[in-house]
Curated annotation (Swiss-Prot):
Residues 379-383 are annotated as: G2. Residues 207-219 have a biased composition (Basic residues). Keywords: Cytoplasm, GTP-binding, Initiation factor, Nucleotide-binding, Protein biosynthesis. One of the essential components for the initiation of protein synthesis. Protects formylmethionyl-tRNA from spontaneous hydrolysis and promotes its binding to the 30S ribosomal subunits. Also involved in the hydrolysis of GTP during the formation of the 70S ribosomal complex. Residues 454-457 are annotated as: G4. It comes from Francisella tularensis subsp. tularensis (strain SCHU S4 / Schu 4). This is Translation initiation factor IF-2. Residues 490-492 are annotated as: G5. PANTHER family: TR-TYPE G DOMAIN-CONTAINING PROTEIN, TRANSLATION INITIATION FACTOR IF-2-RELATED. GTP binds at residues 354-361, 400-404, 454-457.
Length: 846
């Protein structure tokens, strides 16, 4: 039994300290103040004095409460009463002294303290279901308290839990407070009607003292005992409820964990971040980072993801997804209703393609000179990129693109700008690699081909060879039963040019090309450039509708109002119909070749849509770059410094040329050397380009442009060299050479001589000396050697000595005898071969 102070005992029994000190003194226990402690022996003496002073009868009752199939609680209840006088109802009793209630409450409190002091009490896990069952059972047991008309029951039952049995050491939570109060009153009423002998009371006292030592409380739950004591103390000496003292409430967990995972529908937009995706799925960002890591992608919670990656994550985590329609504004603005308009026939749009030096440019020049009015022949703007040719049977629109690279980018953007491809093949050269590539591009775009066999005026021309080579590549001429027209032409003499144009018009009739001539205009950007005094200039091919001066247009991420329009002859015009190439001024910037051009009635919406497109491009670019960097992080780990980088600053005259060169240079990158275009633009090379080149150690390349005076002065000071080109193929070749110079040289072994061992001499001073005959090349003293036996290498090392007769020799040539001493090797035998080699550096090539 734990020690307790007089003040604590007075507080537990609700008595004044002075009154308690007097009562202790009457029992022979001398205490002077409330801070004095009561030993277990004194407490035992106090209990015996109180019990011996009572003229009472006792009764003990043991009940068992089952919670479920495995658990139960045994409760032992001892009740005491004293009959003051007889009444009509035998159940009614009165207390002998009010102090009995205090004594009983004191005993219960002491017993609770005993339980709390046990070191081996095991903490029992609370079981919510067991608590519910216990509450239901106690509610069934509890009945209304007996009331009589004449007297009140003033005696309080003294309750002691003798033993709590909990199988598997699983504890049970404390029962509800109200149910325990009712149960206590019910037990008391049962004790009133019980007649117990004095002898049995004495036996119960002994059992009580024995179990108070701690044996009966090994598996008791202190929380339950303290709550029972608190419930008893909440009644006063007359059985009424006290208002101030309240038993502590048992905290219950109100959240119920869902049995099944909630499936959510996640709306995914382009460039969604990891944190946004986690918030929409109601998970932590670290879980999504973990899923990405398992997919081989390293990411942070603030990183943007592309839609495909976000879809994989949502599906991996068991949710559904919907794609956000970010093109709602674009569809509402750009889609034009043309149901009330009629279609008319339009001129075909033709692109001339072919291998370099096959006469493509010469053929274009001849068509320009012969099919344009003589007075206007020299007035054609060379950079317009598109022009119209009028014939007796109709008009033809030619596209003068920078090459097949730009044509490929147009097809990739989905701009249906070309109707027919004229494939130029030199009769004296035949099919070349770029010819094959042009065929593949045309077939991929499903565009019909008209073959122009050029240079037939040369003596070595062989048109039949060209037909045979193209037939092997599935380009079958009509004369062989195919559907491809072949026309023999000469760009120098003009032979066959009229037949070529007639074949193009015939092919266009078969295609039945039509377009809308009314309504808002639609088209495609052929070329764009920046001109001094005019600003951004774009060459646009109108495909549908009627483009007028003053219209609000949107070209990719650029917008503006058409301030002026010029046709292919450089004349100002007010309107342009389908299949008409025009130059327009007034855009906010330079659009990319292949961007769609649309007319929008509301300038505010055009500006808003341009900003939206620009933002989407930036987000997509950032997401793609981060995906590429992070996906290659593990592969590049530990390989830093192995891959060389050639940094280039590219400036060109027109947007199409810059894009074509950029794509061609990026394709040159290999595992050892990478081409990195850190900046590109249109216009002259400026001082800012030179400053950037110095800071990043980059090469400055100009295509059909030159550096201004300020840039030249700065370049001389900083030692920056400019490289100017006007032919794309020369530029690519020089870049290849520069990349080859960055490659690490390759080490190769070259055998320079072989000596055959004819005889072996043993020397105590020099070891084994091989007498050899040089049968091939030359044997040098300083070069490494290999010893071969039966053409198998058995040793590799260096020469220790090389002698000719008795003199040292630096080298011995073929057909001469010599003595060779191999360093650190004495097992040279007759018939072996000594192979002499040298290691040389060989420059790598791409």
């Amino acid at each position: 039994m734990a020690e307790i102070t007089v003040g604590q005992l007075a507080q537990q029994t609700n008595k004044e300290v002075d009154a308690l000190l007097k009562q202790l003194k009457s029992f022979g226990i001398e205490k002077s103040s409330e801070k004095d402690t009561l030993t277990p022996t004194e407490m035992k003496t106090l209990l015996e004095k109180i019990n011996s002073a009572k003229n009472t009868a006792t009764r003990k009752k043991v009940t068992s409460v089952k919670l479920d199939g495995k658990h139960k609680i045994n409760v032992s209840v001892k009740r005491k009463r004293r009959v003051a006088k007889k009444v009509e109802q035998q159940e009614s009793t009165t207390l002998e002294q009010p102090q009995e209630l205090e004594t009983m409450v004191q005993e219960v409190s002491q017993q609770v303290d005993i339980v709390k002091e046990q070191d081996n009490i095991e903490q029992i896990v609370e079981n919510k279901e067991a608590v519910k069952v216990q509450e239901q059972r106690q509610a069934e047991i509890a009945k209304p308290v007996i009331k009589d008309s004449g007297f009140k029951i003033t005696a309080m039952p003294e309750i002691k839990i003798e033993e709590i049995v909990a199988e598997d050491d699983e504890g049970l939570a404390a029962s509800d407070k109200q149910a325990k109060k009712k149960a206590a009153k019910k037990v008391f009423s049962e004790a009133v009607n019980t007649n117990t002998k004095y002898k049995r009371e004495e036996e119960e006292k002994k059992s009580k003292a024995k179990k108070a030592g701690g044996k009966g409380f090994k598996k008791a739950n202190p929380r339950q005992l303290s709550q029972l004591a608190g419930d008893l103390e909440s009644f006063d000496e007359f059985g009424a409820k006290k208002g101030k003292l309240k038993a502590p409430k048992v905290k219950k967990q109100e959240f119920t964990k869902p049995v099944e995972n909630t499936v959510r529908t996640v709306e995914i937009h382009e460039g969604i971040t990891v944190s946004e995706l986690a918030q929409k799925m109601a998970v932590k960002g670290a879980e999504i980072v973990k899923v990405l890591f398992n997919m081989g992608v390293m990411a942070t919670i603030n990183q943007s993801l592309d839609q495909d990656t976000a879809i994989l994550i949502v599906e991996e985590m068991g949710h559904k997804y919907t794609l956000h329609n970010e093109n709602a504004l674009e569809e509402a603005v750009t889609i034009v209703d043309r149901s009330s308009y009629k279609k008319i026939s339009r001129a075909p749009v033709v692109t001339i393609m072919g291998h370099v030096d096959h006469g493509k440019t010469s053929l274009l020049d001849y068509i320009r000179q012969t099919r344009v009015v003589a007075g206007e022949a020299g007035g054609i703007t060379q950079h317009i990129g598109a022009y119209s040719v009028k014939t007796d049977k109709g008009s033809i629109t030619f596209l003068d693109t920078p090459g097949h690279e730009a044509f490929t980018s147009m097809r990739a953007r989905g701009a249906k700008s070309t109707d027919i491809v004229i494939l130029v093949v030199a009769a004296d050269d035949g099919v070349m690699p770029q010819t094959e590539e042009a065929i593949q591009h045309a077939k991929a775009a499903r565009v019909p081909i008209v073959v122009a066999v050029n240079k037939i005026d040369k003596p070595e021309a062989d048109p039949d060879k060209v037909i045979s080579e193209l037939a092997q590549r599935n380009v079958i001429p009509e004369s062989w039963g195919g559907d491809v027209m072949f026309v023999n032409v000469s760009a120098k003499t003009g032979e066959g040019v009229a037949d070529l144009l007639e074949a193009v018009l015939l092919q266009s009739e078969v295609l039945e090309l039509e377009a809308f001539a009314e309504g808002l205009a639609e088209g495609v950007v052929i070329e764009s450039r920046l001109e001094k005094g005019r600003g951004p200039v774009a060459t646009v091919l109108v495909q549908n509708g009627n483009l007028k001066q003053g219209d609000n247009i949107l070209c990719g991420t650029e917008y503006g109002r058409v301030r002026a329009m010029h046709n292919d002859l450089g004349k100002k015009i007010k309107a342009a119909g389908p299949a008409t190439p025009v130059e327009i001024l007034g855009l906010s910037g330079m659009p990319a070749a292949g961007d769609e051009m649309v007319v929008i009635e509301n300038e505010k919406k055009a500006k808003e849509l341009a900003a939206q497109r620009s933002q989407k491009q930036k987000e997509a670019k950032i997401a793609q770059e981060q995906s590429l960097k992070l996906s290659n992080m593990f592969n590049n780990m530990g390989k830093e410094g192995e891959q060389q980088v050639l940094k280039i600053i590219l400036k060109g005259d027109v947007q199409g040329s810059v894009e074509a060169i950029r794509e061609s240079l990026l394709k040159l990158s290999t595992d050892e050397v990478k081409v990195d275009i850190i900046a590109s633009g249109i216009g002259a090379i400026t001082s800012s380009d030179v400053t950037l080149a110095v800071a990043s150690t980059a090469v400055v390349i100009g295509f059909n442009v030159r550096a201004d005076s300020a840039a030249k002065k700065l370049a001389e000071t900083d030692g920056v060299e400019f490289r100017y080109y006007n032919i794309i193929y020369d530029l690519i070749d020089d870049v290849k050479k520069a990349m080859s110079g960055l490659l690490s040289p390759e080490m190769k072994e070259q055998i320079i001589g072989i000596a055959e061992v004819r005889e072996v001499y043993r020397s105590s001073k020099f070891g084994s000396i091989a007498g050899c005959m040089v049968i091939e090349g030359v044997v040098k003293r300083t070069n490494p050697i290999r010893v071969l036996r039966n053409n198998v290498v058995i040793y590799e090392g260096t020469l220790e000595s090389l002698k000719r007769f008795k003199d040292d020799a630096s080298e011995v040539k073929k057909g001469l005898e010599c003595g060779i001493g191999v360093k650190n090797y004495n097992d040279v035998r007759e018939g072996d071969q000594i192979e002499v080699f040298e290691v040389i550096e060989v420059a790598k090539e791409l």
